[in-house]
């Protein structure tokens, strides 16, 4: 069986778990890992793999799995698609998916490559489950309740804000698809908490939700990477009222 040669682009939490997934996949082989530091301070688990700064240094890459922050996905995907390399990402800014699809669709077709976008759990697998539930009960309302748990995308977004030393963003469900964001941060020296908190609340990841920012002495003491979702569809199948379908999932979020 010919194996697909995959490159891991970015080696944070997502990259680490993609490595494990590829190691367990019988139809894939790891071409190497692309990270900003290259082979400098190479983690022990990467000892047997090529670790480079530029994907061009790897041989025979057929697909690049993008494990970068969401806001970097478009840049890397366009670069690799232009090289004829297929891409897979877990882009998770819901309001930006249509624009990203339009951009990467054009780039992929131009260079005869394939780009699979938003292949995480939400957006991703949850999107498929929602569609299935809506097919079962075509008339009705679907409620998506996340957590309580750590949101990886929101946590990464907070860490990128000036003045934030460490961060944890928790998603708290309040029911019927409404959520509260609880953000815990450690502050860098020389920054005012009120200004940093205001910047967090103004970020696109948080601007549409009730968000509370808390200053804590240690984010690590609060850290639990568990997350989950409850999808509920209440509606009508044919002429039968009060149909109720649920899907529950609990996961290790970075995986």
Predicted region positions:
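Gly/Ser/Thr-rich loops at beta-strand to alpha-helix junctions
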Residues: 12-14, 94-97, 118-126, 148-151, ...
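N-terminal glycine-/serine-/threonine-rich beta1-alpha1-beta2 phosphate-ribose binding loop
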Residues: 1-82
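Rossmann-like NAD(P)H-binding beta-loop-alpha module
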Residues: 125-145, 154-155
